[in-house]
Every structure is written in structure tokens, then in C-alpha cells.
Amino acid sequence: MKLFGSSGIRGITNKEVTTDLALKVGLALGKTKRSAVVGRDPRIAGEMIEHAIISGLLSAGCDVVRIGMVSTPTLAYATKDYDCGVMITASHNPAEYVGIKLWNPDGMAFDSSQQEEIEECIEKEDFEPVNWDQIGNVSEDANAIRQHTNMILQNVKRSSKRVIIDCGCGAGSTITPYVLRKMGCEVITLNSQPDGYFPARNPEPNDTNLTLLKIAVKEFGADIGIAQDGDADRMMAIDEKGEFITGDEMLALFARHECDEGAIIVVPVDTSMMVDDALPGSTVIRTRVGDVYVAEEIKRCNADIGGEPSGSWIFPKISYCPDGIFASAKIMELIENRTLSELKKELPHYPTYRGTVKCDNERKAHVMEVVHSKLEKCGKISDIDGIRVEMDNGWVLVRPSGTEPKIRITAEAREGADRLFSMAENIIKEALN
């Protein structure tokens, strides 16, 4: 049994993630936890899965506090007062998906060993429902958003800039515009009404999905556009010219803003060489893709900052959870005295290509075997996550997605990155034929 991917349990509603599964997760979690805080993003299936997992927790004798519709970082921050946190979300995935992500009191997602413990309990159905008079209590707390907001405002400086915030009809709508206004920003909202159908755009805040935000930034003369995903753990930006800032650029800018020389920065294997060169004297450590793996390494080596080019930024001084609301506030600090386009120009840039090839989950293992046999002849191989081949002029990474039926390709080189990408793409397509 393999329930947990790189970002918790996630799948299509009522097919891969069901109320029966959620009930069992609650029963398994309740075996060792006496208190849990539970939140959800706006997804249509959110309340259904929430009720099921709460039923399991209560049946195991665990007390539950519901905090309603909140962002994932809000839930993670609230977990400090409980034994664990449960977030019902599928993050950036489309509306038909739903998921469950579990959190520790320090804001760290459940690690591999904790996930395996839950999986083993479910597989063996080794549950321990309590007697009728020991069933857990359920209550509600409306203060989680306020507490998260106050924490952010205590850790950022004021800003007078004009910002357009596109929450993608996600959970960030409940907090981000308010935080930015309290900072002193002039805030214009876009797609900032929670709607689990995500009618305005795909929840993932990538370049393709942010066309309206780019137009709005230029039309309203904004200093910046900020976009979040369905649960606001991810955040990306548009500069004042309406240009998308890539994840590698964002990570490099945050590192420069937050860190001193000699800093330790943790990134996944698909991160650009730009980050290594953006902060001279720093140490860049690469991990498996997935914010939980980045967070684990940040904690292990006491790193200064970390993140993923997909839009997850981790500031360990405040939490080990990627926080798209805190990152939104931090980037306003960053552009207070200089434009985002000016800061972007100062970064070293290398041609980078990213893409995906559709691949059914059951065929991924075969495809990766073929990729390994072909690419091992091309350079030094690392298999920390997928297959990364380093060459004199650059590198290419082939990695199966942990949440979707896709294989991801990343290629970067000082020259010829497109050829590296095409080579890997062709190998995958040949293996699928």
C-alpha cells in the first residue's frame, strides 16, 4: 500500500480519495494523538472528507478542533497548540482532486516514518476505537486566521506599494488581502472569493495560468502582481512590466534578501544553478522534490532558507511549512526601494527548459529504467530523486511526478539546454511506445 505521495495523500474525489479512506486515516492518527486541529481549503469535497476524518479521530478518542476554511500555512501555524494538524487540500491540483496532509506541532509535515506508520495501520486495519464514554470531543475555533495574521505582521516591515493579489479563488482569499492591507499596501484583489470549482483559472500559479494577472498589473499600474494556489502554500509573482518571475528567480531573490554570506540554502534537485551563484559564499544543498523533504533538510542542517521553484518558500525562522501568505508579505518588503524587474536583472541566468510527458502511474517504473540505461552514458548520475545527469555544461533531470500521472523533465545548460531537454523527452516517448 502506498497512500502518501510527495505532498501527502492526494487523488481524484470518490475514486482515489474516499470517505472510507479518510475515516481510516482518522482512526490511524487517533491511535497516538490526543488532540488534532482540522482545516480545509474551498474544494467541493472538502467538507465531506473533513467530516469523515473527524469521525475517525473522535472514534479513536482524539479531541478535535475545527478551524474551518483556511490556508494550509494557517493550519500548520495553528498546529503548534495541538498534537497534530490535518489539512484537507489538494493544493495546486485541479478541482476534481482532494487530499489530506498531516502536520506536526513545529509546522513540519509528517515525515516518511510517520506516514509509513499511518499506512501500516490502515493496511492492517489495526485500529483502536474507544468505548462510548471515551469518544473525543469536537469544538470550533475562529481565531486561527487572526493569529496567523498577527504573526506575519510582527515579522515584516510596512510597504506602501500597489499590489494586485490573485488568490485563484482559493483559501488565500480568507487572509492574504487583509495582511497586505494591514502592511500599508494599496491592494487590488483578483479572483479572491473562495470557490471550490476554481472557475477563474487553474489553481497552479504558473506562467500559463496567470494571463489575466499580467494584464491587470499593466492596466492598473501596479508595482507587482502576486498569485497563490488553492491552499496558499504556493506563491508566485509578476513584475511591474507584467512579466512572470520564475521560481528559480524567486528563490534566488528571497535568498539574497533574507540571507548573509555563508548561508545554507536547501532546494530540490530541479533547481537552477542560478541559486548557487546568486549568493556568493553560500552552501546550496539539494534534496528530493517535495516541500516535506526540503523542510526536513532545513531542520536537519539548520538552514537559513529553502524552497522549491514550483512556488513553495520556507522561512524556518517562522515555520517549516511553505507559507504563501508570509512570502507575499516578504516580497513586498523586497520591492519597497527597487522594482522587481531591476532586481531580476541582477541575477545570473542560464537557459532552462521544463516540461512534462503524460505517463500512467503503473508505467513509470519501466520508463525510468529505460531512461537510466540511456542517460548513464552521458555523464555523472544522481538518483536522489529521479535521474539527474550532470555534464560539463549543464544538467538534465527526469523525475516521475509524485502527485500526477506525469514524468517531469528539467534541463539547464550554459549552451544547448534545449537539446538536453529534447534528448530526455525523446527517450521517454520511445519508452512509452
UniProtKB/Swiss-Prot annotation:
Catalytic activity field: alpha-D-glucosamine 1-phosphate = D-glucosamine 6-phosphate
Cofactor binding comment, as recorded: Binds 1 Mg(2+) ion per subunit.
Origin superkingdom: Archaea
GO biological-process terms attached to the record: carbohydrate metabolic process
Cofactor: Mg(2+)
Stored Pfam families: PGM_PMM_I, PGM_PMM_II, PGM_PMM_III, PGM_PMM_IV
Keywords associated with the record: Isomerase, Magnesium, Metal-binding, Phosphoprotein
Modified residues (Phosphoserine): S91
Posttranslational modification: Activated by phosphorylation.
CDD domains cross-referenced by the UniProt entry: PGM_like1
Entry binding sites for Mg(2+): S91, D229, D231, D233
EC number: 5.4.2.10
Single GO molecular function: phosphoglucosamine mutase activity
InterPro entries found in the cross-reference section: A-D-PHexomutase_a/b/a-I (IPR005844), A-D-PHexomutase_a/b/a-I/II/III (IPR016055), A-D-PHexomutase_a/b/a-II (IPR005845), A-D-PHexomutase_a/b/a-III (IPR005846), A-D-PHexomutase_C (IPR005843), A-D-PHexomutase_C_sf (IPR036900), A-D-PHexomutase_CS (IPR016066), Alpha-D-phosphohexomutase_SF (IPR005841)
Keyword Isomerase assigned: yes
Enzyme class: isomerase
Residues annotated as the enzyme's active site: S91 (phosphoserine intermediate)
HAMAP family per record: GlmM_A (MF_01554_A)
Known function: Catalyzes the conversion of glucosamine-6-phosphate to glucosamine-1-phosphate.
Family: Belongs to the phosphohexose mutase family.
Protein name: Probable phosphoglucosamine mutase
Source organism: Methanococcoides burtonii (strain DSM 6242 / NBRC 107633 / OCM 468 / ACE-M)
